[in-house]
Amino acid sequence: MESDVLVVDDSAAIRKILQRVLRQTGMAIRTIHEAGDGQEALEVMSAHKVDLVLTDINMPKMDGLQFLASVRASAQWRQVPVVMITTEGGETKVGEAVRLGAAGYVRKPFTADQIKEKLAGILLSGAPL
């Protein structure tokens, strides 16, 4: 089954890197949507089916934690795996993300292998994709 993925980051360059990495994972990906902040991401999720989200934590307007809380509060999106992306030293925010139900996290700067390993772990855990 092909998956629809949403990449959320305020940096267009990071979004492009994540899209390239996702295409290299070997996952059957139908569509990669993108958004520049949490509010945009909610709009994308309202308009399109999304099976997995990779989101930065630190963003303007609506940050990744606020976005994650909104996703988890929605019966429609509650089961969608959300992987958080954070900078070094973001332990407090990572802890909050895990408490809110994040499927995992990756630290910036990340490698393609780290993203692949995290997604493989989500697949092995049986999270719906």
Go through each PLM region and give its residues:
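Two-component/phosphorelay signaling modules centered on CheY-like receiver
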Residues: A12-H33
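Helix N-cap/capping motif at the beta->alpha junctions
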Residues: E34-E43, G64
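Short amphipathic alpha-helix used as the core "switch/output" element in two-component signaling
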Residues: E43, L65-R78
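Active-site beta3 strand of CheY-like receiver
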Residues: H48-L54
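Active-site residues of response regulator receiver
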Residues: D56, T86
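Receiver (REC) domain active-site loop signature in two-component systems and cognate sites
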Residues: M59
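Alpha4 helix (beta4-alpha4-beta5 surface) of REC/receiver domains from two-component response regulators
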Residues: Q66, G89-G104, E117
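C-terminal output helix
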Residues: F110-A120
